[in-house]
Amino acid sequence: MIPMMTLKRVCRVLLFITQMYVLSGRGFLSFEYSEPVAQPLKDHFPSSTIATSTKATATKIPDYMEKCPSNGQCSRLPSDCMTCATNYSCIYGKPVTFNCTAKNGVVCFDVNSQPQEYFTISMTCQFCWQLPPSDYVCNLSSSCKTVSCPRQRYNTTCTVLDHAHCLGNRTFPKMLYCNWTGGYKWSTALALSITLGGFGADRFYLGQWREGLGKLFSFGGLGIWTLIDVFLISVGYVGPADGSLYI
């Protein structure tokens, strides 16, 4: 009986030692193999970030390249594609010549189709805001009244066209007369005033619905209001309600 109990105790001790050995071995293996796997992942992210950043920097194209023709004549390049040694000592209104170079990345040629680095351009000595209106475009306003006395002006920003050369900033402020149209025709308004003016059709067409209702319910002011409107529309005194000009 005693040997049997002793044998059971020995078996329990051996089983306990075996379990401890297995557990300690698994923990060692888990610690041993998990660290090398984490290390390469840790080292991988910085290199990927650097490669992506380098690639984005290398493929970035300057904004002016969109306006620059490829393999064109240097002297005909847009102003944004060249750098010129301008000066303000020239005589206003007189022809002047400046030395220029194409900007970085712009490839151009001379009249003989040979690559050219330095070239000259001829222009009139004047600042950009002194150019004729055909050489720049401005932001138009539709919030001002064209029919007013005195005639309204508004402040806007103008930009010189690519083919025009000038001194100073190519974007400048300017004050312009209010000049826009909403699509109303003077001939249509006059025809409606003559034919259907007694029903207020001319005023409704111009967007003046209050006056149109007044003419409609008074039968054109018994003809007097109709005659007055024909005269006012014919001379341009009565215009669209939105303040625009006739077409």
Curated annotation (Swiss-Prot):
The chain crosses the membrane at residues 180-200, 216-236. Its main location: membrane. GO terms for cellular component: membrane. The keyword Lipid metabolism does not apply. It is a multi-pass membrane protein. Residues 1-25 form the signal peptide. Pfam families: TM2. Keywords: Glycoprotein, Membrane, Signal, Transmembrane, Transmembrane helix. It is found in: Membrane. Residues 183-231 form the TM2 domain. Residues 201-215 are cytoplasmic. Glycans are attached at N87, N99, N139, N155, N169, N179. Residues 26-179, 237-247 are extracellular. Belongs to the TM2 family. This is TM2 domain-containing protein 3. It comes from Xenopus tropicalis. The gene is tm2d3.
